[in-house]
Every structure is written in structure tokens, then in C-alpha cells.
Amino acid sequence: MNQPKSAPNSTDSAQGLSYRDAGVDIDAGDALVDAIKPFAKKTMRDGVLGGIGGFGALFEVPKKYKEPVLVSGTDGVGTKLRLAFQLNKHDTVGQDLVAMSVNDILVQGAEPLFFLDYFACGKLDVGTAATVVKGIAHGCELSGCALIGGETAEMPGMYPDGEYDLAGFAVGAVEKSKIIDGSTIAPGDVVLGLASSGIHSNGFSLVRKIIERAQPDLNADFDGRSLADALMAPTHIYVKPLLALMQQIAVKGMAHITGGGLVENIPRVLREGLTAELDHRGWPLPPLFSWLQKHGGVADAEMHRVFNCGIGMAVVVSAADADAAIGLLSAAGEQVWKIGVIRESAAGEAQTVVV
């Protein structure tokens, strides 16, 4: 039987397609892996088994833990990335990515052990991606965790050229008996506030709207640096000073001040019937937040539920331990203030109020 003949095809004699023709450059991906290996190597710590490049990353829970509980967190950098694209500034968003997850797992008493990242783009720019990952590795060094693996996804047509998205994943461990969950917080306890380094990584949709309205010169001097650098200051990582504090002080609760600001994050560690009363005079409002409020016409209540307003981490300790905690944190290089007290809630009252 004669086999059917295929229809004439104008591409029969044309050169065959490659993955690069479709927009995916395998060689660029390989070049990125080679570029970032030295950064990842600097983050290695006890527990890491093997190197980068395997199908899965291996980590052995440190033997110092008798009843280890694993604590995981994941987050991104949000629309702060849009400002990074506008400014062509990619060296700080990697630290932002790490900070958002390691600070989250820290509040339950966990020591960050390892971190993985996800970098997605339409067309891979090796230089830009390497700069981002270098920042991720720096964040891992600051938090004492290993950059143990990650994924770079080049997806043509999904993102405009020059743009990318990030996601990060942190895993830590805490002794089961030392989990911090806020259950011991009681009236009379003191709320300490640790200074933020700036806006951190939340509220940037409003920040960008304010910039759009005010049309400032982002290169102009602002409090000793450019306004652009002030806006893009990387999220502070609190891991090492707070882990050290936990070795000496009974920390009752912590809240990473992210989306929702002080008034929505502190209640996450308070049991029903308790309110954190914060005194707005208890800490200085950094100039950048005053600038945002002025140029955006943002109400005080909105500022407190969108931005960290200068406090990146809240720590609850007993009144008897407050001064010692401040001394230890200050000695570790942190700026810290007594910003409030815990009391019983009035009927129908919110669990965090700023007075």
C-alpha cells in the first residue's frame, strides 16, 4: 500500500528551530549558574549536604536540636520591584526577598536554616539576575542561613524585557518547648520597637502613587543620600540580634511589621482580650515617612495600617526584662524603644491602638 504523502511545506527546507529561537537561552541559564555559585558558597553552613545543581537540596537538621520543629515561610518583594525596574537598581531587592521570609519565621523563635529562591523573567539578563542573587546571598549571610537552591524560569511572553518577579522560601527550626506563640503575654508586659531601615517591602503601591503625584527628583539629596536610595533601602534582617536575645531574655511574642503595619501585625501574636496600646511619641517618625505622608496627604490611621512607620519588628517582654532587653539589643547595634504596653481590652476595642 502506498503511504500518504505529506502536503508541501514551505519550512521543509528552512533551518530547524531551536529553544533559543523560541526565546529560551539555555547557555545564558548555564552562565548564570556559574556566576552565582561563588555567592551561594559563601552562605554554606553546618547541615548542608551537597552543592547547588542537584534535583533536590539536602539539609540535615543540626544535632543540637532535641525536639526540632521546622518553621517555613514564603514571600516576595511586591511592587517594590517596579521601582527597581524604573531606577535600574537591582542590588538590594535580593536582601528584601530573604528578609521577608526569615523575619517571619524568626517571630516564632526559629533559627533560619536554609533558603531557596525563584527568579522568573521573560528574557534572562545574566548580569541583572546575578546582581539579584548576589543580594539574596548577602541576605542569607546576614541571617545565618544557607542559599541551598533555587529556580530560574525564563518564560518568553510572560514578562516584558527587563522585568522579573521573585519569590523566596525559608525553612528554620526551633525547639518544640521554645516555640514563641504569644500565649504567655499578659497585661503589664512591654512592647519594644526595633527600628526599620526604611519602608522595607510593603506599601509600595501607595509609594508609587505618591511618587506619581509628587513627581520628585529621585536623584535629589534626601537625608544624606538620594531619595531613590532612601526608597530602595533594603529590608532590615533582625535574625542574629533577636536569636541572641532569646538566649538571655524570655521573649513572649514578636511581630514582623509588614503589610498591615503596626495595627494589623501586633494583634497576630495577642490572645483575645488583650490590647497593645502604642504611644506614637515613643519613637521618632523617620523623615521618609513624613515625606510620604505630606506628599500623599495620607491620614495618620492609614499610615499606621500601611507602613511600618519606623518600626520593623515589635518584641513583647515582661516589664522586669524590658531594660535588659533594650541594653542587649542596643549593644548588638539595634535601635530600640519602649513603644507601648499590653493591657486588657475594653469592650469592642481593637487589639492594637496608637494614641
From Swiss-Prot:
Pathway this chain belongs to: Purine metabolism; IMP biosynthesis via de novo pathway; 5-amino-1-(5-phospho-D-ribosyl)imidazole from N(2)-formyl-N(1)-(5-phospho-D-ribosyl)glycinamide: step 2/2
Database matches in InterPro entries: PurM-like_C_dom (IPR010918), PurM-like_C_sf (IPR036676), PurM-like_N (IPR016188), PurM-like_N_sf (IPR036921), PurM_cligase (IPR004733)
Reaction catalysed by this enzyme: 2-formamido-N(1)-(5-O-phospho-beta-D-ribosyl)acetamidine + ATP = 5-amino-1-(5-phospho-beta-D-ribosyl)imidazole + ADP + phosphate + H(+)
Principal location class: cytoplasm
The keyword Transmembrane is annotated on this UniProt entry: no
GO terms assigned for molecular function: ATP binding; phosphoribosylamine-glycine ligase activity; phosphoribosylformylglycinamidine cyclo-ligase activity
Locations listed in the record: Cytoplasm
Signal peptide: none
GO aspect biological process, one term: 'de novo' IMP biosynthetic process
Documented EC number(s): 6.3.3.1
A GO CC term attached to the entry: cytosol
Superkingdom of source: Bacteria
Keywords assigned by UniProt, alphabetized: ATP-binding, Cytoplasm, Ligase, Nucleotide-binding, Purine biosynthesis
Family to which the UniProt record says this protein belongs: Belongs to the AIR synthase family.
Name of the protein this chain belongs to: Phosphoribosylformylglycinamidine cyclo-ligase
Organism: Paraburkholderia phytofirmans (strain DSM 17436 / LMG 22146 / PsJN) (Burkholderia phytofirmans)
